[in-house]
């Protein structure tokens, strides 16, 4: 053991490259790798500046992660800029949710609701999911294990402090931490949509036009969160002349006739066909509102919905309408 002088603190790591790996000695290739995998780690990565007459070093990574900063220190513009960076979308998001979880499990999430549906939204096997980081180190794109399929339009980042750096897609499918994060992030995404629906009805209407059909799938696929999904639904209705889907179940309940116990709806090939259906005649005469559904998935998803706030949902094309106090002897049987 002897004492030696070292110009700087730290550890020197020398990497010897094989002949078929010389590309990793190329400065441009190295910069690209650093920016992809280590752009957000807490430490600066420096490389010799290209074209400098003397040896100069420059930082090639950001050395910070926006999602690790306190929400109070991040501006709306920074959130929007980061969304465009990770999504390659030119439009600002409709909403976002930034959260840090500490305790038994530690992770940070930053979720976004896009303004427009991607071209492959209806390709259920297409690329989807969040960008996954572990302790700020980039792991993979399209980590689809953290949100259910009906929320495939959500963009964002999940950064875990508990997962191993060498995590694989196979390991993600069999991990208790991932299951817990999936449940929590699903709740967080639905809370974000609920807040948007109450705080900005116009923006939520824009969201529904783009993603409403996908969100409906959750009624069938995610029974645990059905009660959170039901208030988010929007329908066309006989109370409106237009076929705009802007009526919530809460709106319907608030307009119930005296003595009316059920929520009535009708499924048809189009809203126009629904409006001209003979099944509506009796209810129109009694001034009872009927929700009009015309999506291809409606027959499938509405089979999973039985009631809302104590009121049964009844398809007017099937069986007894159970009008109760609103019935009269002149009504057809």
Question: Across the structure, where does each feature detected by a protein language model lie?
Answer:
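Conserved GHKL (Bergerat-fold) ATPase module
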Residues: 1-333
């Amino acid at each position: 053991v002897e004492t030696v002088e070292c110009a700087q603190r730290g550890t020197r790591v020398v990497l010897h490259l094989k002949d078929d790996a010389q590309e990793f000695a190329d400065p441009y290739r190295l910069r690209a790798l650093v920016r992809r995998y280590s752009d957000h780690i807490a430490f600066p990565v420096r490389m010799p500046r290209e074209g400098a007459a003397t040896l100069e070093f420059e930082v090639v990574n950001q050395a910070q992660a926006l999602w690790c900063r306190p929400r109070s220190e991040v501006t709306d513009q920074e959130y929007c800029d980061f969304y465009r960076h990770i999504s390659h979308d030119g439009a600002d998001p409709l909403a976002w949710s930034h959260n840090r979880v500490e305790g038994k499990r530690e992770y940070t999430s930053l979720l976004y609701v896009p303004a427009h549906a991607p071209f492959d939204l209806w390709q259920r096997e297409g690329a989807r999911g969040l960008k996954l980081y572990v302790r700020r180190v980039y792991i993979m794109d399209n980590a689809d294990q953290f949100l259910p399929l009906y929320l495939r339009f959500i963009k964002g980042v999940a950064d875990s402090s508990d997962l191993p750096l060498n995590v694989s897609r196979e390991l993600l499918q069999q991990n208790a931490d991932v299951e817990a994060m999936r449940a929590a992030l699903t709740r967080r995404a639905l809370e974000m949509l609920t807040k948007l629906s109450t705080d900005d009805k116009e923006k939520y209407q824009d969201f529904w036009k783009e993603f409403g059909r996908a969100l409906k799938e959750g009624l069938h696929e995610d029974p645990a969160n059905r009660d959170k999904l039901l208030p988010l639904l929007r329908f066309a209705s006989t109370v409106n002349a237009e076929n705009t889907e802007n009526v919530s179940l809460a709106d319907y309940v608030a307009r119930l006739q005296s003595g009316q116990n059920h929520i009535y709806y009708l499924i048809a090939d189009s809203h126009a066909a629904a409006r001209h259906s003979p099944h509506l005649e009796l209810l129109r005469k009694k001034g009872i509102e009927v929700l009009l559904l015309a999506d291809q998935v409606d027959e499938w998803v509405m089979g999973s919905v039985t009631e809302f706030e104590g009121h049964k949902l009844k398809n007017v094309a099937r069986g007894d309408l159970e009008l109760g106090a609103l019935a009269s002897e002149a009504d057809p049987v």
